[in-house]
Amino acid sequence: MFKFSNLKKIFIVAEIGVNHEGDLNVAMDLIKKADEAGVNAVKFQTYKVEKYISSTQQDRRNRAKRFQLSREQFEVLSKEAKKRKLKFFSTPLHMDDIGFLRKISDIIKISSGDLTNLELIKYAARGYQNLVISTGLGTQKEIREAVNTVFKEKPTIRKNEGLVLMHCVSAYPAPEKELNLANIKWLQ
């Protein structure tokens, strides 16, 4: 079974997200290119527009729908990654997505936007031995609460073994004065 603590070198993740723009062929090509670049994993975003965006925001729904892949397409992508010996994982934007992703991935990433969504974190912790939590925009108190939620929900998981915290600066590109790299030490 995969464990972050068993890694002997840097674990490089290709953040594909929604850069495939809803096109399975583009997503497959991005996995191929990531493999050729020597990464260890590919990461996507998984969502269903109707669970993620209010029905009162039809324009926004229509835009987001163009970037959405079906569950069947995610299964194809997961198999392609595994065939290439790459870890496949995704960021779910709804609890239903977590249930689906459990079937195709043994790692899950919680977005910094969901750092304070403790119900989502609890649900993810129940079904995964490997959680990655992004901390962008989170306060130290919020990060502590998220970590404690994971430990309480799944006492067998440990930081830097099954739980990985990612230092994230939620500004793109990030101004150098806002990088706060010293925070990485605190996260450890």
Language-model region placement:
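Catalytic cores and adjacent flexible loops of soluble metabolic enzymes
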Residues: 1-188
